[in-house]
Amino acid sequence: MRINPTASGPGVSTLEKKNLGRIAQIIGPVLDVAFPPGKMPNIYNALVVKGRDTVGQQINVTCEVQQLLGNNRVRAVAMSATDGLTRGMEVIDTGAPLSVPVGGATLGRIFNVLGEPVDNLGPVDTRTTSPIHKSAPAFIQLDTKFSIFETGIKVVDLLAPYRRGGKIGLFGGAGVGKTVLIMELINNIAKAHGGVSVFGGVGERTREGNDLYMEMKESGVINEQNLAESKVALVYGQMNEPPGARMRVGLTALTMAEYFRDVNEQDVLLFIDNIFRFVQAGSEVSALLGRMPSAVGYQPTLSTEMGSLQERITSTKEGSITSIQAVYVPADDLTDPAPATTFAHLDATTVLSRGLAAKGIYPAVDPLDSTSTMLQPRIVGEEHYETAQRVKQTLQRYKELQDIIAILGLDELSEEDRLTVARARKIERFLSQPFFVAEVFTGSPGKYVGLAETIRGFKLILSGELDGLPEQAFYLVGNIDEATAKATQLEMESKLKK
């Protein structure tokens, strides 16, 4: 981290103008730059191209050195569009990696990959900046305590609980609710934990980024009157950005989160939507950098790139970064190298199912596919563990019986199996929950359900005490008391209809 004596923008100081090169070749987002002998920039140094295009428009493009080619040439990846650049243009070596503003000044603001504000709310205090490339914390600094991170979402807290300071993956194909789940987590965590969040929008839709910002302003997560009281900093490198920006925007967000952890000694939440786009951007650039493609056309450096990002997301003795990452699964194939590489780094996986989404059960979290290293009796306690296992067993048995039901019907099942199916259907519906951020779509007010309430509810269903209630009563409710109240209401309505 660098403390700059004065607040200055990302411009280049006169000191750093000593090292000048010229553009030798441009292939899409990749530039080759020739430097004088003995004046080669280091790998990851930021280069700035300044000048005017043929129409006289001002050009200011920042690039990052990726390779030293020999013959006094370097190959760099542009962080913004290369429109208007021509061969022979002057390139300035800044002598350091990209640095971005960090600290309280970033809260409530939206940044791009370079740490420049893009929300039209004026300049940001850049006296404290930090380079985006750093080493992961040393082993001796790491914190190894286990504790649960309560989210207020029943299916998550019961069946695949999150670890404080852990890494969580949200897996799902297109349109099954990854972004809505992330928005709900930001909302719940800001309200229940009062923690600071950093949101990295990596290669996703600009519209979603805008919706998220508006939503945060409405819910008070971003305080427009006093930005310093906001609970989140936003960093966007959306779908329309060049691959260089999408490849580095995750590191920009992580750098801001690291400052809150290491200097402010806070517990931080880092949201990355979507980690697959980080890999995708790397693969777009990889071929242009002259690397041989690996399996399924991905970059050969896939594991290294992923590791260098993920190893920095961890808990230290000062504070923690709990990271929740949406993972787009291409063609719903979990064996694809991108999601498969991500799996290796995660403490918990929340898998979203298209089948459940089609049934209208939201959040569409697959209770049997989602996993967590925290679901052990010595960590969560015997009661929680037993309840979770019995819920899974009931749902698994229901899954096994579905073929028989489809062919022969429910009547052919034994009494015991029919009871299991009835309870499993209630459990399936009780795992749904109205979200605060989806109130406008569902018309139901959002619900935050504490862990103790969640366990109590599922124990009652499993014990058979609620066998007499209709399964519809368990759909889109908060705790179990709401389900019993809804059952009474449904009974009244049916009597009135008669």
Swiss-Prot record:
Quaternary state and interactors: F-type ATPases have 2 components, CF(1) - the catalytic core - and CF(0) - the membrane proton channel. CF(1) has five subunits: alpha(3), beta(3), gamma(1), delta(1), epsilon(1). CF(0) has four main subunits: a(1), b(1), b'(1) and c(9-12).
NCBIfam families: atpD (TIGR01039)
EC identifiers of the protein: 7.1.2.2
Pfam family, one: ATP-synt_ab_N
GO (cellular component) term, any one: proton-transporting ATP synthase complex
Taxonomic classification: Eukaryota, Viridiplantae, Streptophyta, Embryophyta, Tracheophyta
Alphabetical keyword list: ATP synthesis, ATP-binding, CF(1), Chloroplast, Hydrogen ion transport, Ion transport, Membrane, Nucleotide-binding, Plastid, Thylakoid, Translocase, Transport
InterPro entries, per the entry: AAA+_ATPase, ATP-synt_VA_C, ATP_synth_F1_bsu, ATPase_a/bsu_AS, ATPase_alpha/beta_chains, ATPase_F1/V1/A1_a/bsu_N, ATPase_F1/V1/A1_a/bsu_N_sf, ATPase_F1/V1/A1_a/bsu_nucl-bd
Reaction catalysis annotation: ATP + H2O + 4 H(+)(in) = ADP + phosphate + 5 H(+)(out)
Primary location group: plastid
Function: Produces ATP from ADP in the presence of a proton gradient across the membrane. The catalytic sites are hosted primarily by the beta subunits.
PROSITE patterns in the record: ATPASE_ALPHA_BETA
An example Gene Ontology molecular-function term: ATP hydrolysis activity
Protein name: ATP synthase subunit beta, chloroplastic
